[in-house]
């Protein structure tokens, strides 16, 4: 029996995979990733908000307050506070100050409509003067709940939220912060949802599935940033692909994939020229890349943001890659670059299938995703490994992530070259581990889309057309 998640099978005993949950404090960015992935698994944002607000109400009851003042921002943290107010209505005298910014999230707007049907005092504020008018309420309460910013708080706090925090700190009542204290506020207690984001927090579960944390998903793309309107050529990445010889098309597929994933400039060092006008071809002397070509390639490695080595290279040219590695700041190593001795760049990403992993590490990768994760950690490779399979395993030696997107139709030749190219483009803008997670997720989803129309007739070139549909549609939806 298996559990089917996002098109690929996963072992049904997921309790074995709890060991891959990250340890320590959770960053706000990581929590947003998990939240988004939970929604992709069918847990709606409203459901998560209801669970968070219920936990916040439970924490508030421990104070046994007669009067509660709840301060709600316009983001999802404010929605958590509104849910808590609804649950506490009738148990205490509830006053809700909510920031009427005109930019509430959809979920918070829904919770506000629900709140207005409850027996609570609801007071919108738009300015510092609105708060000054109600200063007395801050002093005449038994508990203040801070649901102003939470994990959404970044940078300096602006008015009128700054005054709201000032008045809360000057009040006599204890402050209970929802999830993460708003910047500048001094809480008596922190009610953290799912996992702690700061020391001393009390954790309340909100029903987030395990796979939302340990698997890739649309939330992984949140780290990507849209380009500024004044961006210039090169800001998306200058990628160098080194490959070709026995297999002429592989480096070009990888280069085109990098372009489709947002790279601005792609050069391909290869013995053979294929007419691809979007790619800059750098020829080598013979039918294979040899050490005689180092003088040509080394300056290009120094110039590139990311160097992708290996597609279509052939084993005879492996010594060239090991000689180039010291000159590579960020490197993606695939195919015939995955041999002993393993090349190590300043920052390295390795993209082996099971056989290549065994060849480069001397270890059996195992069969299950769990066994493969342990094999990568045991190998102690200096970099991030994306071990391809029915379920891809991404590991940087400490963090582990699983990717379940994809389809059996992706066994067609060249899909690994596309994945490597996508990862190279992403690595120009994010670290290797994140590039591997996003690259695996996006390439797999692209394969799922193409399979709907092409079935098992899909080619790697077909995959190129779907990569930007997945990657940049998801990017625009974050706006």
Swiss-Prot record:
Q: What does the entry comment about cofactor binding? A: Binds 1 potassium ion per subunit.
Describe the location of the YjeF N-terminal domain by residue ranges. 31-214
Task: Map out region (ADP-dependent (S)-NAD(P)H-hydrate dehydratase) in residue numbers.
Answer: 216-479
Q: Where does (6S)-NADPHX 2 bind?
A: 312, 417
Ranges for the region named NADPHX 1 are 76-80, 150-156
The residues covered by the YjeF C-terminal domain are: 216-474
Q: What PROSITE patterns does the annotation carry?
A: YJEF_C_3, YJEF_N
Q: Where is this region: NAD(P)H-hydrate epimerase?
A: 1-214
Positions of region (NADPHX 2): 353-359
The free-text function statement in the UniProt record for this protein reads:
Bifunctional enzyme that catalyzes the epimerization of the S- and R-forms of NAD(P)HX and the dehydration of the S-form of NAD(P)HX at the expense of ADP, which is converted to AMP. This allows the repair of both epimers of NAD(P)HX, a damaged form of NAD(P)H that is a result of enzymatic or heat-dependent hydration.
Q: What is this protein called?
A: Bifunctional NAD(P)H-hydrate repair enzyme Nnr
Species this protein is from? Methanospirillum hungatei JF-1 (strain ATCC 27890 / DSM 864 / NBRC 100397 / JF-1)
């Amino acid at each position: 029996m298996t559990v089917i998640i996002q098109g690929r099978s996963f072992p049904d005993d997921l309790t074995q995979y709890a060991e891959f949950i990250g340890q320590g404090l959770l960053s706000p960015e990581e929590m947003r990733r998990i939240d988004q992935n939970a929604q992709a698994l069918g847990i709606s944002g409203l459901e998560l908000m209801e669970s968070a607000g219920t936990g916040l109400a439970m924490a508030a009851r421990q104070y046994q307050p007669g009067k509660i003042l709840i301060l709600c921002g316009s983001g999802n943290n404010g929605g958590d506070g509104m849910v808590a107010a609804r649950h506490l209505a009738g148990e205490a005298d509830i006053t809700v100050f909510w920031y009427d910014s005109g930019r509430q999230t959809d979920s918070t707007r829904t919770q506000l409509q629900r709140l207005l049907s409850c027996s609570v005092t609801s007071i919108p504020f738009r300015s510092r003067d609105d708060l000054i008018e109600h200063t007395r309420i801050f002093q005449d309460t038994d508990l203040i709940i801070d649901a102003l910013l939470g994990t959404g708080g970044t940078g300096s706090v602006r008015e009128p939220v700054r005054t709201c925090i000032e008045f809360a700190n000057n009040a006599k009542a204890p402050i209970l912060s929802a999830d993460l204290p708003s910047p500048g506020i001094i809480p008596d207690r922190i009610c953290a949802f799912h996992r702690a984001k700061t020391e001393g927090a009390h954790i309340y579960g909100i029903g987030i599935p395990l796979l939302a944390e340990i698997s890739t998903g649309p939330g992984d793309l949140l780290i990507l940033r849209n380009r500024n309107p004044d961006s210039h050529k090169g800001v998306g990445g200058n990628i160098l692909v080194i490959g070709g010889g026995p297999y002429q098309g592989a480096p070009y597929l990888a280069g085109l994939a990098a372009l489709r994933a947002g790279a601005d400039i792609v050069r391909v060092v290869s013995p053979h020229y294929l007419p691809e006008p979007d790619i800059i071809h750098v020829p080598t002397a013979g039918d294979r890349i040899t050490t005689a070509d180092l003088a040509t390639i080394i300056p290009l490695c120094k110039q590139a943001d990311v160097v992708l080595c290996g597609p279509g290279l052939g084993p005879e040219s492996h010594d060239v890659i090991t000689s180039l590695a010291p000159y590579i700041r960020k490197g993606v190593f695939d195919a015939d670059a995955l041999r002993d001795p393993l090349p190590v760049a300043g920052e390295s990403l390795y993209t082996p299938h099971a056989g290549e992993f065994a060849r480069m590490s001397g270890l059996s990768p195992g069969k299950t995703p769990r066994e493969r994760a342990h094999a990568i950690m045991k190998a102690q490779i200096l970099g991030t490994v994306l071990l391809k399979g029915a379920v891809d395993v991404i590991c940087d030696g400490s963090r582990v992530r699983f990717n379940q997107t994809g389809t059996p139709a992706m066994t067609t030749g060249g899909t690994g070259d596309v994945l490597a190219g996508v990862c190279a483009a992403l690595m120009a803008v994010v670290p290797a581990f994140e590039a591997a997670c996003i690259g695996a997720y996006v390439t797999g989803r692209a394969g799922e889309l193409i399979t709907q129309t092409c079935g098992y007739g899909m080619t790697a070139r077909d995959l190129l057309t779907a990569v930007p549909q997945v990657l940049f549609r998801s990017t625009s939806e974050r706006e």
